[in-house]
Regions:
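Glycine-rich phosphate/diphosphate-binding loops and the adjacent beta-loop-alpha structural elements
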Residues: 3, 36-49, 199-217
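Cofactor-/ligand-binding subdomain signature composed of acidic, glycine-rich
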Residues: 1-21, 189-202
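Internal, active-site/partner-interface "lid" segment
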Residues: 151-157, 179-216
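A ubiquitous structural signal for well-ordered alpha-helices
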Residues: 10-13, 17, 30-33, 59, ...
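A short, well-structured juxtamembrane/interface segment
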Residues: 19-40
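Short, glycine-rich nucleotide/cofactor-binding loops
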Residues: 15-25, 94-103
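Electropositive phosphate-/nucleotide-binding environments in soluble metabolic enzymes
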Residues: 4, 8-11, 24-31, 53, ...
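Glycine-rich phosphate-binding loops that contact phosphosugars or nucleotide phosphates
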Residues: 43-184
Length: 217
């Protein structure tokens, strides 16, 4: 008999987030920042330490699939030449994910980004407790703290083995990106048009084409 405690924990954590006014407000602000970056053709950098790093890679790929310049940054390698071309005058957005919000590698990255790209806005998505949140708030390089109020039990049930928190990170990012394209300035048709251009072959191309024909009629 399969034990569904993990699924129940995920649902409970998502519901806690959904029912928290502050968390929902923060996700809305993040969505608006993503929307403005897309409208301004900015590069959106996404990073995370450990397992959230894989969530960051996935969401950078999601942005690319809808013709947005989404780039994953390995925070550990950023200070060793991996930041790529430097455009001091071009605004950009850096979104970092850390459950505690206290990953030192991220703070080093924030410092580099602000030095090399002064117009880059830095966002920290975290599930910090109050003590951890004090450290996040003390960082002057962070422009916006997307604090999510939830207490995931993780795979082990004691908050140790990352699993539930990664689902929360994915939910936050997907909601924010989807919300950006639900806005009047962009719209779902715009997202589908971008998806159509980035998928010139395969079954998805025909599905998107049919959907666009339906939406336009």
């Amino acid at each position: 008999m399969i034990n569904f405690d993990f699924i129940n924990d995920c649902l409970a954590s998502l519901n806690t987030m959904r029912n928290d006014v502050g968390s929902m407000k923060n996700i809305n602000i993040l969505s608006d920042m993503i929307k403005e970056a897309i409208l301004d053709n900015q590069t959106i950098y996404i990073t995370g330490i450990g397992k959230p790093g894989y969530i960051a890679q996935k969401n950078a790929a999601t942005l690319k699939s809808i013709m947005v310049d989404g780039q994953f940054i390995d925070a550990c390698l950023a200070g060793h030449g991996d930041l790529g071309p430097i455009s001091v005058d071009k605004p950009s957005l850096l979104i970092a994910m850390s459950k505690s919000g206290c990953s030192n590698e991220l703070y080093v990255l924030f410092k580099y980004m602000k030095q090399l790209r002064p117009k880059c806005k830095v966002v920290m998505i975290c599930m910090s407790n109050e003590m951890q949140l004090n450290k996040v708030r003390s960082c002057k390089d962070i422009d916006f703290i997307c604090h999510i109020k939830t207490d995931p039990g993780e795979l082990d049930g004691f908050g140790i083995v990352p699993a539930t928190s990664n689902i929360i990170f994915e939910a936050v990012m997907s909601t924010a990106i989807y919300g950006a394209f639900k806005s009047e300035e962009l719209g779902i048709v715009n997202m589908c048009e971008r998806l159509q251009k980035s998928h010139p072959s395969g079954t998805l191309q025909s599905k998107v084409t049919n959907l666009l024909n339906t939406l336009r009629n």
